[in-house]
């Protein structure tokens, strides 16, 4: 790969991350410059895989796209590593994996978790939703931490709490989008407990039962966030940088308290940058 191609690939990934995951992109501005390219590559990959459902109308094309990514990472099948050089996100991701010795199996588990996205199966229960968060959002935190040189068992536990907090928050933020395509990430046991009817969610009826379920989900997200922050209070600053997106999660959870289910809050890019800068400047870490 030429230097010119490498710069073009990195710029493509930065634009993709900035467009689809500004929360992580903003955090990347405050990490050591030499690690930023890998952060962006990971974020761009996550955006590609997370948005597969948005680009397909049937499960099979989504499965094929996800399998291509598996093949790229393992060097097997149609998505060989040679072919990957033609894809800027794949090329940048493979560079990051090689440079920072990132575990391929973590990326593969993330891809496997996103197979759920291309179908309309209900999320069975809270345990299944938390497992999904573990393999997606928590995995992203752990990978970013490893790029920064922080990969201890303590960091892994923080990543678990942070990932669940972020994942549950994103489920609430994405409720209108999911409901519009008759897809539910709300856990089935919580829906049953609160008397939430799936068809009413699909019709975007924000009734009391749904609000009660979301309140409980929000409390769990807040609890997970607080546990992550408590553990970060004594963590090295290098490790804390991996969790900068939590500053935004805290703000969103607060706004969700006064929002309607199908009119979730939004933070401006300036607001995201401000919250991230404050967290990056704080000692110890706070969100």
What positions do the PLM features span?
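Alpha-helical transmembrane segments of multipass membrane proteins
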Residues: 143-147
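Acidic/His metal-coordination segments adjacent to aromatic residues that form catalytic metal sites
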Residues: 115-128, 206
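Catalytic cores of Mg2+-dependent Asp-rich isoprenoid enzymes
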Residues: 1-96, 100-111, 133-142, 154-168, ...
């Amino acid at each position: 790969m030429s230097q010119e191609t490498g710069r073009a690939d990195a710029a493509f990934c930065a634009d993709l991350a900035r467009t689809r995951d500004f929360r992580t992109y903003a955090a990347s501005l405050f990490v050591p410059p030499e690690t930023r390219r890998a952060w962006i590559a990971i974020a761009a990959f996550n955006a590609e895989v997370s948005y597969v459902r948005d680009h397909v109308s049937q499960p099979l094309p989504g499965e094929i796209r996800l399998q291509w990514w598996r093949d790229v990472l393992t060097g097997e099948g149609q998505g060989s590593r040679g072919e990957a050089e033609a894809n800027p996100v794949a090329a940048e991701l493979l560079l990051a994996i090689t440079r920072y010795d990132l575990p391929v199996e973590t990326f593969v588990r993330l891809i496997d978790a996103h197979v759920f996205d291309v179908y309309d199966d209900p999320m069975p229960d809270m345990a299944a939703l938390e497992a999904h968060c573990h393999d997606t959002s928590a995995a992203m935190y752990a990978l970013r931490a490893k790029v920064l040189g922080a990969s201890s068992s303590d960091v892994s536990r923080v990543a678990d709490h942070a990932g669940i907090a972020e994942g549950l928050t994103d489920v609430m933020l994405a409720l209108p989008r999911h409901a519009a395509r008759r897809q539910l990430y709300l856990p089935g046991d919580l829906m049953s407990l609160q008397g939430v009817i799936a068809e009413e969610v699909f019709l975007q009826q924000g009734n009391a039962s749904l609000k009660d379920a979301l309140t409980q989900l929000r409390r769990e997200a807040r609890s997970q966030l607080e546990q992550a922050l408590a553990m970060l209070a004594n963590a090295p600053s290098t490790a804390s940088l991996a969790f900068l997106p939590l500053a935004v999660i805290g703000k969103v959870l607060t706004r969700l308290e006064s929002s309607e289910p199908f009119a979730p809050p939004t933070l401006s890019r300036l607001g995201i940058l401000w919250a991230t800068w404050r967290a990056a400047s704080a000692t110890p870490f706070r969100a």
